[in-house]
């Protein structure tokens, strides 16, 4: 895959700036037409996209459709239904002191946007933000990950066939291309990736005070209380940890489990892995592989940080890693300080005052992107109230991202800003306050020398 030259990046950036300045993207009819074009493209290119996902990630058609294609299509359809209402000028209340004025809230597109996505959900995490950009009336440059070259190539061809470069374009390459992109002046940067790279993005954005949306990650805790339904918890956790082979930003990262139920949970977890993936998970076409050799070596390197109590099989040739439970893990080890991004699961056993110890543990670390609790719902709400995370679930994992009616985003080290549904439109928009004042009367109290100040003070 050929990297995009710096000269090409500058030319595309300048062309999109000029196109936005022309006002062509302001019309709601234009935006809806572009959303329809993107939806049509998703339908036409579905096979090429899902084939590429299989080649790059060993992601089955079913999983590719459920976790990538359908999410983007659903987002497009939502925006088609709602964008006219979101973009409509709204009247706001005007207090008597502003008489004879009318107050309005106006949505305007931020302008030219840069969208940088990772490799783990390379279709969804690139094109879902694009829906928000189109809906809000922005132009967009898309930068897919070089670690999924087949997917990135298909997306580039699809976008080139569907849109003019001056409106939406794809650039390809590694970090040198990211550097060239970040040297340009954008009106919004939408970045999905690691906190380390996000700091580079923020540093670049700060030069021009460019707003950013950062969708990051972190170590999302999975808490299993003694009141949990063990079989249901094991099934849902096993699904969440093996979905995309753990290469999900909101995958449960580590387990905090009540000592009384540890043995029962380990047994149930092993059983549910078999129910989901068969007797030999390596033969299951729905089980995704590590994205590359570097990721395989990094994740298998965590095995040395504790004692394996389930799983542990690997195959370097196919980058296969069996779901693996590990106990007796030092809290300062890489396994408990780095985002795992794989099917390895450290388990911390807690005895005594479970709720307070869990709260102390979670709040002593960076704020995670997700938080999962299994047990009595009221106890889950209490722990959620006293901790912080981007989002989460009680008695489930991952499913909060599936509801388009609630926003998705991080907090602190797990990100800033949010998107999905209206929040995607808002992410690429600026909210203006406009007052239109009549000229048929001009109340004198606001003007110097404030001769009626005494009366005005009483009114205010």
Predicted regions and their residues:
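Rossmann-like NAD(P) dinucleotide-binding subdomain of oxidoreductase/dehydrogenase enzymes
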Residues: 96-232
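N-terminal Rossmann-like NAD(P)+-binding subdomain of aldehyde/semialdehyde dehydrogenases
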Residues: 1-104
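Hydrophobic packing residues within well-ordered alpha-helices of enzyme cores
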Residues: 152-155, 181, 201, 265, ...
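Residue-level signal for inorganic ion chemistry
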Residues: 31, 76, 137, 168, ...
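Conserved C-terminal structural/oligomerization subdomain of aldehyde/semialdehyde dehydrogenase
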Residues: 2-3, 26-27, 321-460
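Structural signal for hydrophobic packing residues in well-ordered secondary-structure cores
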Residues: 39-42, 46, 57, 80-87, ...
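Short hydrophobic/charged patches on amphipathic alpha-helices used for structural packing
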Residues: 102, 178-179, 234, 356-359, ...
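ALDH superfamily catalytic-core signature
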Residues: 3, 163, 196-331, 352-353, ...
């Amino acid at each position: 895959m050929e990297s995009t030259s710096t000269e090409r990046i500058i030319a595309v950036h300048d062309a999109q700036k000029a196109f936005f300045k022309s006002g062509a993207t302001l019309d709601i009819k234009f935006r809806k037409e572009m959303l329809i074009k993107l939806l049509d493209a998703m339908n036409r290119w579905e096979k090429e996209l899902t084939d590429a996902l299989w080649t790059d990630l060993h992601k089955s058609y079913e999983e590719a459709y459920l976790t990538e294609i359908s999410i983007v299509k659903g987002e497009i359809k939502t925006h088609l239904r709602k964008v006219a209402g979101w973009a409509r000028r709204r009247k706001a209340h005007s207090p008597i002191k502003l008489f004879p004025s009318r107050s309005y809230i106006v949505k305007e597109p931020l302008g030219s946007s840069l969208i940088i996505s990772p490799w783990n959900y390379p279709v969804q995490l690139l094109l879902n933000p694009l829906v928000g950009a189109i809906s809000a009336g922005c132009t967009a440059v898309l930068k897919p990950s070089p670690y999924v070259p087949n997917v990135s190539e298909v997306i580039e061809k699809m976008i080139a066939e569907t849109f003019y470069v001056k409106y939406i374009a794809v650039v390809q390459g590694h970090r040198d291309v990211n550097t060239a992109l970040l040297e340009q002046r954008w009106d919004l940067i939408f970045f999905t990736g690691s906190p380390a790279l996000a700091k580079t993005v923020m540093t670049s954005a700060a030069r021009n005070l460019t707003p950013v949306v950062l969708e990051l990650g972190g170590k999302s805790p999975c808490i299993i209380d003694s009141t949990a339904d063990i079989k249901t918890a094991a099934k849902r956790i096993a699904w969440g940890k093996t979905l995309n082979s753990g290469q999900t930003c909101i995958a449960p990262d580590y387990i905090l489990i009540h000592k009384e139920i540890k043995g029962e949970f380990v047994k149930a977890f092993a059983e549910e892995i078999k129910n989901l993936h068969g007797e030999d998970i390596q033969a299951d076409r729905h089980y995704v592989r590590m994205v590359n050799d570097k990721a395989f070596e990094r994740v298998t390197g965590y095995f040395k940080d504790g004692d394996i109590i389930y799983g542990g099989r690997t195959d370097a040739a196919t980058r296969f890693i069996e779901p693996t439970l590990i106990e007796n893990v030092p809290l300062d080890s890489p396994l408990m300080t780095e985002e795992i991004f794989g099917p390895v699961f450290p388990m911390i056993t807690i005895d005594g005052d479970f709720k307070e110890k869990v709260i102390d543990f979670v709040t002593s670390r960076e704020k995670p992107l997700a938080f999962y609790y299994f047990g009595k719902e009221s106890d889950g709400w209490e722990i959620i109230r006293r901790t912080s995370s981007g989002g989460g679930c009680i008695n489930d994992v991952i499913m909060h991202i599936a509801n388009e009616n609630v926003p998705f985003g991080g907090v602190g080290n797990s990100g800033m800003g949010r998107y999905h549904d209206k929040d995607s439109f808002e992410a690429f928009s600026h909210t203006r306050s406009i007052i239109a004042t009549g000229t048929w009367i001009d109340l004198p109290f606001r003007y110097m020398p404030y001769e009626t100040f005494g009366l005005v003070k009483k009114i205010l």
